[in-house]
From Swiss-Prot:
Gene name of the record: ispD
Source species, domain of life: Bacteria
Keywords for this protein: Isoprene biosynthesis, Nucleotidyltransferase, Transferase
Protein family per UniProt: Belongs to the IspD/TarI cytidylyltransferase family. IspD subfamily.
Pathway: Isoprenoid biosynthesis; isopentenyl diphosphate biosynthesis via DXP pathway; isopentenyl diphosphate from 1-deoxy-D-xylulose 5-phosphate: step 2/6
GO process terms (BP): isopentenyl diphosphate biosynthetic process, methylerythritol 4-phosphate pathway
Gene3D superfamilies xref list: Spore Coat Polysaccharide Biosynthesis Protein SpsA, Chain A (3.90.550.10)
Name assigned to this protein: 2-C-methyl-D-erythritol 4-phosphate cytidylyltransferase
Species whose genome carries this gene: Acidithiobacillus ferrooxidans (strain ATCC 23270 / DSM 14882 / CIP 104768 / NCIMB 8455)
Amino acid sequence: MERVWVVIPAGGRGQRFGAAQAKQYVLLRDRPVIAHTLAAFLGEPRIAGIQLVLPGEDIATGAWRELLGPMPAPLLPPVVGGGLRADSVRLGLEALLRQGAVPSDWVLVHDAARPCLRREDLLRLLESLANAPQGALLAVPVADTLKRGEDGCSSGTVDREGLWRALTPQAFPLGALLAALEAARAGNRQITDEASAMEAQGWRPRLIPGHGDNIKVTLSDDLMLAAAILAARSEEG
């Protein structure tokens, strides 16, 4: 099987979070959010390398190293991200090619602000790749009733049949994902996740059921929820 790499884009500042520092560096149970994010991948023997993509000033000042400490294998030296998430992912993929990855290798892209990824979900995604030539992503079926809003009022109910919430990691062949992101950039298309870039190229990635507690820390309230999730797991042993 081709090697598996990980790209963790953390080039943004998370303006919606409202903290003075980037949300990936905010402390969660006495460790930065991004340290919890990395922990899900460390120790997995199928992962050849983990590529962090960070703001340029964080790399220049070494702020990331002060927060994360020594780089455990297989964490690679970070690279500077771009203005948009898709740009940061693209730059991370290019860095992996310079590190010895090849286009046929698999790459998992995971949000830096998702610190609650379960190891069992990661393993399920990795195991799915043998039968997912067009890629795969963790997702959960939509359970809530969905409303369409107009001028602050509900104007209708959206049929949730067949709807899923996309999570990360999302896994694709490195070369194909890089080409899809470059095509989206050339066409000035909005890319919300890696699957959307691949879907625009006609790909149909597999939806791998994950857990809803793989939340993204976007608002300050999310940090309290993430802390509760991690605390509950710690108590479970």
